Amino acid sequence: MWIFYIPISIHILILAFRYGGIRQLSAINPCMPNGGLVDSNKAGNLLAIQADLPETVAKTGLLRAELPASLAKLDEVMTELELSFPIILKPNSGQRGMGVSVIDDSTAAERYLTTYKDTDILVQEYIDGEEFGVFYMREPSSPNGFVFSITHKLFPKMTGDGTSTLERLILEDPRAHYMARFLLKQHAEQLERIPEKGEQIEMVEIGSHCRGSVFIDANAYLTPVLEARIDEISKAISGYYYGRYDLRVSSIDALKQGKDIKIIEANGLTSESTDIYDPKNSLIDAYKVVFRQWYLAFKIAKQNRINGERVSSYREILSSVRSLNRGPS
C-alpha cells in the first residue's frame, strides 16, 4: 500500500518547492491546529456547527483529559446532550477510525474510558442511516465553496447459509478475510453461532476503510442543492476552507436534497478524497484526483498565508505528529 504514496509524496514535495515549503500547508484551516494535519480539533469544528446549525450535526460533547474520565462525568455529558446508549466515543485527535467505538452500555463505556484515560474524548450521538464522505473546499478569495468529491461508505455484511459458523463466513469471505483479525475480535462472542440461511449480520458500524468498510464513488449524487447546503454548513466554522465531512443521512435521496444531514466528523488537511478507493476507479484516475487535491490544498493555503494567517513552525508540526503516534496511554 505504501508504494501507492511514493508518486504522491514526490508531487507534494514539488508543490512545496513551488509554494515556499511544506509548512505553508498549516495555514489552510486557521480554525485547526496546523491546519488539521492530525485533525487535532474535531470537537471545535463540530461544536462550531452545533452552535449555528444544530440540526445538521450529531449531538457532540467533550470529556477533557485534564479531568479524569469517569462514568459519572460521561453521564453528566449524556444528560446535558439528552443522549442514551448506544453512543459514539472517540479520541478528539486521530485518523482512519482510530479509537472510534460504538458503545452500547455502561460496561463498555467504562472499559473505553480506562483505555483512553489520558485523551480528550468526544461523546457523540449515534446516528443510523447511510454514511458518506463529502470533501469540501473553498478558496479564501471566493464567496462560495464547492464539493470536490463524494464517497458512499458501505458496511460489509455476512449472509448466513444455514450451515457455516460466523467465523467461517468471515474467513471465507473474499473481502472480510483481509480484516479477519479485527472482525473476529469484534464478534468474538458469536463466532460459533450459525446464522440462518439468508440472515445478514452487519460486521462494522464505523465508516473506515481500514476497518472493513467499502468505499464507492458517489460523485453522481452531487446536486446544486446539496453543494449549497454543504457550503452553508462549512461557513459556520470560521476559518474552515478544506477538508472532508463524514456524515450520515436517512437516504440517498435525502443527501441529494441536502436534507437530514448529520455531520459526525469534520476533518482537515490530511483528509483523503476517499472515492479513489472505489474498485471501479483505475490507478491513473486515483492519482489524478489526489494530485489535484494537493494542488488545491497548496493554492488555498498560499492565499490564507498572503491574507496574514499564521504558518506553524516545523517544531510545532513534528510535535503534533509525535502526539498522534503515541496514541492512548
Model-derived segments and spans:
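A short acidic, glycine-rich active-site loop
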Residues: 34-37
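A short glycine-rich, hydrophobically flanked beta-strand micro-motif that places a catalytic Asp/Glu
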Residues: 125, 133-135, 240-254
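Coil-to-beta-strand transition motifs
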Residues: 129-131, 140-147, 239-242, 255-261, ...
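C-terminal active-site "lid" helix and adjoining low-complexity regulatory extension at the edge
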Residues: 250-329
